[in-house]
UniProtKB/Swiss-Prot annotation:
Organism of this sequence: Bacillus cereus (strain ATCC 14579 / DSM 31 / CCUG 7414 / JCM 2152 / NBRC 15305 / NCIMB 9373 / NCTC 2599 / NRRL B-3711)
BP-aspect Gene Ontology terms: 2-deoxyribose 1-phosphate catabolic process; carbohydrate catabolic process; deoxyribonucleotide catabolic process
NCBIfam families in the record: deoC
GO cellular-component term (any): cytoplasm
SUPFAM superfamilies, alphabetized: Aldolase
A Pfam entry, by short name: DeoC
The organism's place on the tree of life at top rank: Bacteria
Function: Catalyzes a reversible aldol reaction between acetaldehyde and D-glyceraldehyde 3-phosphate to generate 2-deoxy-D-ribose 5-phosphate.
Name of the featured protein: Deoxyribose-phosphate aldolase
Reaction(s) this enzyme catalyzes, per UniProt: 2-deoxy-D-ribose 5-phosphate = D-glyceraldehyde 3-phosphate + acetaldehyde
Localization in the cell: Cytoplasm
SMART domains: DeoC (SM01133)
Keywords: Cytoplasm, Lyase, Schiff base
One of the record's GO molecular function terms: deoxyribose-phosphate aldolase activity
Length: 223
């Protein structure tokens, strides 16, 4: 298995510098990761630098809380695509999900999907660590109904990250035709292999190089 082509090479910390982003971009070129996942201000730089390389440009929407308005998320999506993003990872309205406001949650996702239609893949971050199993299933069902391409476990900025159990539940819920992305706490090749075995079709990690080289000592924390 070519694990590199399943990895979104990620850097999303608030103190990320241009030098940090360039390092991630160069590593993505070298190891041929599926994408680089970066904050929106770096999208144009990444798109320019990765032109002609088989590496997608992924960014985040409504990140990390999901607490932006639907209109804001849709605008962020259009803006990111205009600057060169080919994948967007959006955070759901977690509070609305917990309130049982399925209509709002679905509309929130749907508007981002519509903004991205034909131009970028949409991955929906449900923030599993804050949800019950019933809420995880409902979030996945609403994501599929709204037309999302992927569901994703975590932002990497909340109380927990991906677990194999959550990946299995999400895969069972969405079926074979929607992607499942494991993110948050995936730091070693063993972690990544567990997620893929459980049903993940993409892995988000900042320790991507260590994962590919199977070097546990090189793994870094978080995003």
């Amino acid at each position: 298995m070519n694990i590199a082509k399943l990895i979104d090479h990620t850097i999303l910390k608030a103190n990320t510098t241009k030098e940090d982003v360039m390092k991630v971009i160069e590593e993505a070129k070298e190891y041929k990761f599926a994408s680089v996942c970066i904050n929106p201000p770096w999208v144009k730089l990444a798109a320019d630098e990765l032109a002609g390389h088989d590496v997608d440009v992924c960014t985040v929407i409504g990140f990390p809380l999901g607490a932006s308005t639907t209109e804001t998320k849709a605008f962020e999506t259009k803006d990111a695509i205009a600057k060169g993003a080919t994948e967007v990872d959006m955070v759901i309205n977690v509070g609305a999900l917990k309130d049982g406001d399925n209509e709002l949650v679905e509309k929130d996702i749907y508007e981002v999907v519509q903004a991205a239609k034909g131009k970028a893949l949409v991955k929906v971050i449900i923030e599993t660590c804050l949800l019950t199993d019933e809420e995880k299933v409902r979030a996945c069902e609403l994501s599929v109904k709204a037309g999302a391409d992927f569901v994703k476990t975590s932002t990497g900025f909340s109380t927990g990250g991906a677990t194999a159990e959550d990946i299995a539940l999400m895969r069972k819920t969405v079926g074979p035709n929607v992607g499942v992305k494991a993110s948050g706490g995936v730091r070693t090749r063993e972690d990544a292999d567990k997620m893929v075995a459980a049903g993940a079709s993409r892995v988000g990690a900042s320790a991507s190089v260590a994962i590919v080289l199977n070097d546990a000592k090189g793994a870094t924390d978080n995003y």
